[in-house]
Regions:
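Short, charged, amphipathic alpha-helices and their helix-cap/turn boundaries
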Residues: 31-32, 111-136, 160-179
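Active-site SXXK
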Residues: 30, 45-70, 97, 150-154, ...
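Structured C-terminal helix/loop/strand segments within mature extracytoplasmic catalytic/sensor domains
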Residues: 18, 28, 263-307
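A short, well-structured edge-of-sheet supersecondary motif
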Residues: 7-40, 69, 269-270, 276-280
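Catalytic tyrosine of NAD(P)H-dependent dehydrogenase/reductases that use a Tyr as the general acid/base
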Residues: 47, 140-142
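Active-site Gly/Thr loop motif
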Residues: 227-279
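Active-site helix/loop module of the DD-peptidase/beta-lactamase fold
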Residues: 66-104, 129, 157-193, 197
């Protein structure tokens, strides 16, 4: 059975079981080969899937000499460093932020907290006042604040906002428009989540990575960055098969060589390098993605594709 047949079987399951899915598609390195929408196609909030775009922007910035993985957070924002700053604060690097190992060891600035006003009005000042609990680089702790700090380091180095930088270096080259992006109280795009994207454009990110950093022959991001960002950089505490390691703002997936950009409620792009395929799905906030859709996606599409 081919990939399209497997896809069609999964679509039939969605319909017969009334699974809470908005859209699903498969692409190879060149084009979408199968796609199905259950609601009108539109840009939607893809939550933490955003983090993988920020990783890509940072990879481009590193290639351009604006940053390095060893760039220190405090060097980007010396004016925010408290007079009684911990030694550990000065040890936090871009690498630590990208691997969710800053040492804060707490899930700061996650979506519910942001929406309730935590950290406002100045996320940088808020995070610089938090205690670094463990040695940077020693412990994985998933936190949108780490992504936000990495994004602000890029903005500082590039001299522009994240949306502007990503448009010039990434989106415009993929024939995408200016990104709609939720911002913090000071107008900075939230690197931890909040970009709005169509299913087809989510797939494009995966296709660039599937093609080792190119889009229809044009180099977008270095092959070296693709391999680093999509490879396991740090172990993650095991809670289920989906927590099997983390790269630079990409999750590892439980299939050979596979990884994913993963946003809340089921906004996910999975890259399957061995099969030369990318699978993307969008789901509603009202659905139980983790307990209903994710197991079905695994058992009825991703496992058959990778068998």
């Amino acid at each position: 059975m081919g990939a399209i047949d497997m896809f069609n079987d999964f679509v039939k399951l969605i319909e017969s079981e009334s699974l809470p899915v908005e859209a699903v598609a498969i692409a190879d390195g060149d084009a979408i080969i199968a796609e199905r929408h259950f609601v009108p196609d539109q840009d939607r909030n893809i939550y933490s899937h955003t983090k993988s775009y920020v990783s890509t922007a940072i990879g481009i910035a590193i290639e351009d000499g604006l940053l390095s993985l060893d760039s220190r957070l405090v060097d980007s924002f010396p004016e925010y460093v408290p007079s009684d700053a911990q030694l550990e604060l000065g040890q936090i690097t871009l690498r630590h932020l990208l691997t969710m190992s800053s040492g804060y060891n707490h899930a700061y600035l996650m979506n519910p907290d942001r929406r309730s006003g935590v950290g406002a009005p100045d996320y940088l000042r808020y995070m610089f006042s938090r205690r670094v609990e463990v040695e940077p680089g020693s412990t994985f702790c998933y936190s949108s604040a780490d992504s936000d700090l990495a994004g602000r380091m890029l903005e500082q180095a590039a001299g522009m906002r994240l949306g502007e930088y990503l448009y010039g270096t990434f989106f415009s080259k993929l024939d995408q428009g200016w990104p709609v992006w939720e911002c913090d109280p000071q107008g900075h795009p939230i690197a931890g989540g909040g970009i709005y994207m169509s299913l087809a454009n989510m797939l494009k990110l995966g296709q660039v990575y599937l093609n080792d950093g190119t889009w229809h022959g044009t180099r977008i991001v270095s092959e070296s960055w693709v391999k680093q960002a999509s490879g396991k950089q740090i172990d993650t505490p095991y809670s289920n098969i989906w927590t099997c390691g983390y790269g630079y703002q990409f999750w590892m997936s439980p299939y050979e060589g596979a990884y994913r950009a993963d946003g809340a409620y089921g906004q996910i792009t999975t890259v399957l390098p061995k099969q030369g395929l990318v699978v993307a799905i969008q789901c509603p906030e009202s659905g139980d993605f983790d307990n209903i859709v994710r197991p079905a996606l695994h058992e009825h599409l991703l496992l058959p594709l990778t068998a």
